[in-house]
């Protein structure tokens, strides 16, 4: 019987398939992988694998540019950004481009420029991808040894890791430069309802920056997600950028220690599994960051957070009923607790009613009304500004709830709008992608470990029913 898998040790795990289908001269017989296994056929062809990666980058950048221009074409400056189904423009606005006081979009030309630059970049990447996939050398080791590699070469692998870390660090410093020198970034906490400003004094104190990592993730603590000022965010990027760059230099100059050589599996599929695990972790952290944090993801662009929409509703009705003569400090609700305001178990004055569970919300439209012991009753009576009323009324009807068929908002809220918050989309997509990346990590880690242990052939396939069936083609 014909052998249905490659006997070469360098292709450790195969999936059985119709071996007669050939694609570009790289069929299952010669590579051990079927056509649909995609880049697995290129594991030992560094030149072709480079082409696949560059072309993939071109597709990503093309999508970014095309979607960017699509959003610019559909953008209505008179409506809130978060009401228009935009997923890219909020990021550009957060970086301070085209934004005026209060988060108002005053100029869409920078967004157009961004889209065009991405399209041009995608053309360059696309050309490079096609060149390396079809024309360039199959392997780089002979012609361009600097770019060549062997997956087992531990020293070369950590050198490549170091180069990647330096590039990541440079990326972190791009945000730092934008915030410090090139026009600043949007600060939702700027007085009067947010504005673009330069961050002149980033936090560099290590106890402040790394203190976030030591915080509890629960309640009012909130781990790194609790960061609520741009000084700490930009200072954190200074620290992370520096750590990435110095770590990259370290990995380029050193060889892996003996314990690391023993602990890790050193194969292409193992590196894939490590990368998927890291991306999965990033996805889960980003999910929480987007959902709860309104400093890095300003509500003016992404819509309010869940707690923010809830507290905004309590605030809106407090303002209304206070105007109608209600004594908001003493009025009781149906449970005997305060209808508008109540005391938390530790004595702070917080909003009453169902929103009491969101007592730890911090939002720029609400913080000016706090005193040393929670909400300040005299400020609530005398100091509420029109912009605070307008913003809370807007946020009240734009809770980040909704389903994929775009029926959004609070089900019981008669003023809710038919929309899905970009905050919901961004948070949910990162959770779902993070989950699937984690499954991919388990899958590829299992295969890589099995190959390293030498039992990669799996169960005996001699009596598999599919072997007696007619080939698909």
From Swiss-Prot:
It is found in: Plastid, Chloroplast thylakoid membrane. The chain crosses the membrane at residues 69-93, 134-155, 178-200, 255-275, 291-312, 447-471. Residues 1-14 form a propeptide. Binds multiple chlorophylls and provides some of the ligands for the Ca-4Mn-5O cluster of the oxygen-evolving complex. It may also provide a ligand for a Cl- that is required for oxygen evolution. PSII binds additional chlorophylls, carotenoids and specific lipids. It is a multi-pass membrane protein. Keywords: Acetylation, Chlorophyll, Chloroplast, Chromophore, Manganese, Membrane, Metal-binding, Phosphoprotein, Photosynthesis, Photosystem II, Plastid, Thylakoid, Transmembrane, Transmembrane helix. The modification Phosphothreonine is found at residue 15. [CaMn4O5] cluster binds at residue 367. One of its GO terms (cellular component) is photosystem II. NCBIfam families: psbC (TIGR01153). PSII is composed of 1 copy each of membrane proteins PsbA, PsbB, PsbC, PsbD, PsbE, PsbF, PsbH, PsbI, PsbJ, PsbK, PsbL, PsbM, PsbT, PsbX, PsbY, PsbZ, Psb30/Ycf12, at least 3 peripheral proteins of the oxygen-evolving complex and a large number of cofactors. It forms dimeric complexes. Belongs to the PsbB/PsbC family. PsbC subfamily. This is Photosystem II CP43 reaction center protein.
